[in-house]
Curated annotation (Swiss-Prot):
The encoding gene: RPC82
GO CC terms: RNA polymerase III complex
Record keywords: DNA-directed RNA polymerase, Nucleus, Transcription, Zinc
Name this polypeptide is given: DNA-directed RNA polymerase III subunit RPC3
Pfam families reported for this sequence: HTH_9, POLR3C_WHD, RNA_pol_Rpc82
GO BP term, example: DNA-templated transcription
Stretches for region Disordered: 335-371
Subcellular location: Nucleus
Segments for region (Leucine-zipper): 526-547
InterPro entries: POLR3C_WHD, RNA_pol_III_RPC82-rel_HTH, RNA_pol_III_Rpc82_C, RPC3, WH-like_DNA-bd_sf
Species assigned in the record: Yarrowia lipolytica (strain CLIB 122 / E 150) (Yeast)
Gene3D superfamilies, A to Z: Winged helix-like DNA-binding domain superfamily/Winged helix DNA-binding domain
Subunit structure: Component of the RNA polymerase III (Pol III) complex consisting of 17 subunits.
The family this protein is said to belong to: Belongs to the RNA polymerase beta chain family.
């Protein structure tokens, strides 16, 4: 169960980032309300009005918009009985809690829209379909802006001539889980849901049981019920009026006759975006370590999991549902890729088209003989079939390279279909985190510091003398790097005094690496960098208030060349360039947050 106020993840730097995000996009009121909830915890509307010194009407107005986007969650209690209630009325006391996870998704809104545009911009056979991509991207963007929306309301606001195509796009996005239905429990804190389930299960257990046994059993039952409720959200039937979903070899097969439920309330699914982003990040790491050919093969392998996984936290295990064969990869990969061209029997390069025989005439070899066209066609068909097998063999060789890597990209689990492979995402992402952290250490402190960090990770706990032998460097130089690594939390030191006076000369210092602590500390630095980037964007825009207000005029939109002066065009170009650089930097920083926190 995830916690809204986990001390390892919810920090002052993250809270400051949430304020900056809301202030820049949703206004000062939203930032003040969420800031108060982050600082003081759950509060009622009256308590918020008191802590923020805002009118109660303004607090209610701001909370309505925040709850719609699930930036703020609520929990209702009956004032008389004090019990939890789902019926909100005059006798209800409603408490509000800030949901920093949804607030942070604002950073990724642009990336999610681009992912939708890229995925749906490809038609059958890999052909480009930009119209479909733009239409689906617009749907995703609108849902990200408004938080959630009923299908009937969205279609009603759509021009009549576009409704059929928009409805079809929504249905496809729902089938692929880029959109998911919103359920009532998603507007409530998980901690409160768990507490209510725990009390319900505890009250049903007999009092004859030991108190500790009753609490343990109630906790297990509550956790199971909460997980089951969350899993129901991933049901492929949700959002459709009728029809069933069959499964073949663990892969969902969707009934195209199903009708979209116009009363369903939908929202964008950030978990699907994380699955796609994780695949791309793993493929980039494979390219760095194993080459472009192996990385492209790995990218195709990972793409097979997109339809089988609904989130990065989903448990997987080797089996028919999550095993990928070399033949499956060979069907979608480009056979012209360097390193995959078949060699040997079955290859066109080795088995060329039969040459025409020259016929001897009275004047010499002047004419060419004919050959049987049917025989050549049969041979070419055999070559095509053999080339498919040879391609699968070449794919299998690249997968073996990935399986042999110490970064645990993939595991070999069988020989079916030219070779069966399974990606253990937990191990692969843990190796990804370690590799990216070492990369950051190298950027900041150099290769020697990275080498020392690797040595400590391999050996567990080591002292300076052992590190000197491993790194082949003098003690003084090693100590300087160790102190740098200790200052950023990459290494911790344990003191083992050999005497009671704890003298430094008689103390053994053991250096070790705690991965979770190191990743948490580096995440705080990244949050601070993201906050500064957003503040810098706001500061750059504040320098040109008149120009930006002019761009908002209806007569200027789309006619900038006509209404803007040369100086204004130059200022606008400079602003766009600075914004682009900052946005690229923010995207890279968010990529690191995904690696260290979300995968």
């Amino acid at each position: 169960m995830s916690e809204l106020h986990n001390p390892d993840q919810s920090s002052r730097a993250l809270f400051d980032l949430c304020r900056v995000l809301l202030k820049g996009i949703y206004g000062e009121l939203s930032a003040v309300l969420v800031g108060s909830l982050l600082d003081y915890g759950r509060q009622t509307a009256a308590e918020l009005a008191k802590t923020t010194k805002l009118p109660l009407s303004a607090v209610h107005s701001g909370l309505a918009a925040l709850v719609q986007n699930r930036f703020v969650l609520y929990w209702a209690n009956d004032r008389k009985s004090g019990r939890d209630t789902d019926d909100i009325g005059e006798s209800s006391s409603i408490h509000y809690v800030a949901n920093w996870k949804e607030i942070y998704q604002v950073v990724r809104a642009g990336g999610m829209v681009d992912a939708v545009r890229k995925d749906f911009g490809k038609g059958p056979g890999g052909k480009s379909n930009p119209e479909s991509g733009e239409r689906c991207a617009e749907i995703a963007q609108n849902l990200l802006v408004y938080g959630h929306m009923r299908v009937a309301d969205y279609l009603e606001a759509t021009p009549e001539h576009d409704r059929d195509s928009v409805e079809a796009s929504i249905a496809v996005m729902l089938r692929k889980r880029f959109l998911v239905p919103v359920q009532a429990w998603q507007f409530k804190p998980e901690t409160d849901l768990y507490a209510r389930m725990f009390r319900d299960h505890l009250s049903k257990l007999p009092l004859s049981m030991a108190e500790s046994a009753r609490k343990n059993q109630a906790a297990v039952s509550a956790k199971t019920e909460l997980e089951r409720m969350q899993e129901e959200r991933n049901s492929l039937n949700l959002g459709f009026v009728s029809g069933s979903v069959a499964r073949t070899k663990g892969v969902p097969v969707l009934n195209r006759a199903e009708k979209l439920d116009h009363q369903a309330v939908l929202c964008a699914n950030p978990d699907k975006f994380l699955v796609i982003a994780r695949n791309e990040e793993l493929a980039k790491l494979a390219e760095e370590r194993c080459g472009k050919t192996a990385a492209e093969v790995y990218r195709q392998c990972l793409s097979k999991y997109v339809g089988r996984l609904h989130s990065c936290t989903q448990d997987t295990s080797p089996g028919a549902e999550f095993n990928i064969t070399s033949m499956e990869i060979a069907k979608t990969i480009d056979p012209r890729l360097d390193g995959l061209r078949p060699r040997g029997k079955g290859s066109r390069s080795v088995s060329p088209r039969p040459q025409s025989k020259r016929v001897k005439t009275e004047e010499g070899y002047t004419k060419t003989g004919d050959y049987d066209e049917k025989e050549v066609d049969v041979e070419e068909d055999m070559e095509e079939e053999l080339s498919g097998v040879a391609l699968a063999t070449a794919v299998s060789k690249q997968m073996q390279i990935l399986a042999a890597s110490p970064l645990k990209f993939v595991q070999s689990v069988g020989t079916k279909g030219g070779g069966e492979w399974y990606v253990n995402f937990k191990e692969a992402t843990e190796c990804l985190r370690g590799a990216r952290y070492e990369q950051i250490i190298q950027w900041k402190y150099g290769r020697v510091a990275k080498r020392l960090l690797r040595a400590v990770k391999d050996k567990g706990k080591v002292d300076e003398k052992l590190l000197t032998n491993i790194a082949l460097l003098p003690v003084k130089e090693i100590l300087n790097h160790l102190h740098d690594l200790h200052s950023v939390g990459a290494l911790d030191v344990q003191e083992l005094p050999r005497t009671a006076d704890r003298a430094a000369s008689r103390t053994i210092f053991l250096w070790h690496h705690r991965a979770n602590r190191a990743y948490s500390l580096i995440s705080q630095d990244i949050y601070k960098s993201l906050s500064r980037c957003f503040e810098r964007v706001a500061a750059e825009r504040a320098k040109l208030p008149i120009l930006l207000s002019k761009l908002q005029r209806e007569d200027v939109k789309g006619h900038e060349d006509e209404f803007l002066t040369e100086q204004e065009k130059a200022d606008l170009k400079g602003l766009r360039m600075r914004e682009e650089k900052l946005l690229v930097q923010m995207n890279r920083l968010d990529g690191l947050i995904r690696v260290f926190r979300d995968y």
